Swiss-Prot record:
Lineage: superkingdom: Bacteria
Subcellular location: Cytoplasm
EC number: 3.2.2.27
Primary site of residence: cytoplasm
GO CC list: cytoplasm
Xref: CDD domains: UDG-F1-like
SUPFAM superfamilies in the record: Uracil-DNA glycosylase-like
BP term (GO), one: base-excision repair, AP site formation via deaminated base removal
Species of provenance: Shouchella clausii (strain KSM-K16) (Alkalihalobacillus clausii)
Protein name in the entry: Uracil-DNA glycosylase
Name of the gene: ung
Gene3D superfamilies: Uracil-DNA glycosylase-like domain
InterPro entries listed in its UniProt record: UDG_fam1, Ura-DNA_Glyclase_AS, Uracil-DNA_glycosylase-like, Uracil-DNA_glycosylase-like_sf
Family recorded in the similarity comment: Belongs to the uracil-DNA glycosylase (UDG) superfamily. UNG family.
Record-linked NCBIfam families: PRK05254.1-1, PRK05254.1-2, PRK05254.1-4, PRK05254.1-5, ung
Length: 232
């Protein structure tokens, strides 16, 4: 059975046979056996499962998963519904409200965005508990670089959202003459006041999507009570 269960398998499924990925897989087997690692192994590729390749309209690039209990579930910036909204996501909600009048919600579960074609992609897809950056340089970056290359080559253009220096390092892999690139400071409390607040990324994305003849993203998330009927 393929690891990726939709059209992503045709696009990047070959990566799973490459030497770097086989080494990464052995590393992950050891880590999941000997350490507490997030997200759960079954959630590693959720970004791809929720947002098929041909449906990607927007990419919001993160770094590595949240490293606290019950937070990470395979989507960048998103957390499971039952845990507190992380500070960076709170700042994203604040900017959404200022930008588009979107009401902040009482959870951080972003799957409704993913279902609309927003690929919530971290450049590293796993992390040890309480050790940010602990799976950096193990092979994930090569894998997610291929994801970005595949989207860059695709005929249908994509809006790439690059917040902070880590994400902006990927800019050279993106053809800015074909795709939209949105850059600013990261929404982290350490940097949000240095150019994230007031950057209006969400309205820029929707304006561009409409110019492309595509439906805008409905950024308004359901409240937590409604999530259970949403089908989390």
């Amino acid at each position: 059975m393929p690891i990726l269960r939709n059209d992503w398998n045709d696009v990047i499924g070959g990566e799973f046979q490459k030497t770097y990925y086989l080494e990464l897989r052995e590393f992950l087997k050891r880590e999941y056996k000997e350490q507490t690692v997030y997200p759960h192994m079954n959630d590693l590729f959720n970004a791809f499962h929720y947002t098929p390749f041909e449906q990607v309209k927007v990419v919001i690039l993160g770094q590595d998963p949240y490293h606290g209990p019950n937070q990470a579930h395979g989507l960048s910036f998103s957390v499971k519904p039952e845990v507190a909204v992380p500070p960076s996501l709170k700042n994203m909600y604040k900017e959404l409200q200022d930008d588009l009048g979107v009401t902040p919600v009482d959870h951080g579960y972003l799957q409704p965005w993913a279902d609309q074609g927003v690929l919530l992609l971290n450049t590293v897809l796993s992390v040890r508990k309480r050790q940010p950056g602990s799976h950096k340089g193990k092979g994930w970056e090569l894998f997610t670089n291929e994801v970005i290359h595949a989207l860059n080559k695709r005929e249908e253009p994509v809006a790439f959202v690059l917040w902070g220096r880590h994400a902006q390092a990927k800019k050279e892999a993106i053809d800015a003459t074909r795709h939209l690139i949105i850059e600013s400071a990261h929404p982290s409390p350490f940097s949000a006041n240095r150019g994230f607040f007031g950057s209006r990324p969400f309205s820029k994305i929707n304006h561009w999507l409409q110019e492309q003849g595509k439906a805008p993203v409905d950024w308004q998330l359901p409240m937590k009570a409604e999530l259970y009927s949403y089908g989390k």
